[in-house]
Amino acid sequence: MAKKNINHLKHGKHSKFARFFVDKRSTRSVGGNIVLIIFLTLLALMFLFPIVFMFNNAFKPLHELLKFPPDTFVRNPTLDNFLDLSDMFSNSLVPLSRYIFNTFFIVIIGTAGQIVIASMAAYPLAKYEFYGNEFISKLIVMSLMFSTAVTAVPNYVIISKLSLIDTYWAIILPAFSSTLGLYLMKNFMSQVPSSIIESANIDGANEFTTLWRVVMPIVKPAWITFFILSFQSMWGVTGGNFIYSENLKTLSYTLGQIAKAGFWNVTGVDIARQGVVAAVSLIMFVFPVTIYIIIQNNVIETMTMSGMKE
């Protein structure tokens, strides 16, 4: 059957590109496959090298960190960098547990809010025709071209007028308006067959129930992918422009300040804190990557999902 389809593509009335693709695929040699595998392996190693280097740096003693040229792998692993970081927090007026609570509170509420709001906004845009639908969809695409730096000043003005400066909501509320999440959810919800929604309505389900009990399970790969993107974004938010009280600051902000202090002080480069900087980098990197590894299958499913047809 497959051979018949290939012959049909070769001799049928199809584009030159399709015939060229089939010819190349059917005549590709074993040597070509080996070259492709070698190329992809080298590409993977190139992306993996910075991660391996960062992991090893976190456990290097100071004399290995300052060695030039640097060694990729640690020779005398130590936990001194993490112990130094712990000592810095123990001498702080605010305990480490408070920074961790602030971070997870902001990340969890912000991420959940983005998914809920983006899904509820995307559903009518994807499944219902109304005046202005196309205009709103184009506006969403256009808004993706704007950097967050462009909206920094308007966000500050709005947050200030709402008297939310120096509160958790100064960071959480701006995150709720995620155009990327709205765009992603709309595209996937538009692939859900309308017959499924009509069947749910016939069975007596209202729009709210249809969205959360029928549509959301179908587009699970999409909102899990959005969850990862949102989590990574919220995890890296410092909130330094909106929060001034030390007991409300996030772990990301505090670790970032420690890293900056490790690079520079009044006299120049602060050599003594380079190990702490390496430990900070690893801590900020590990948790988002762990979340991604746990649910990576859903992300891959999102990338390979070809759509559904009635």
Language model features with spans:
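A hydrophobic, multi-pass inner-membrane permease signature
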Residues: 2-310
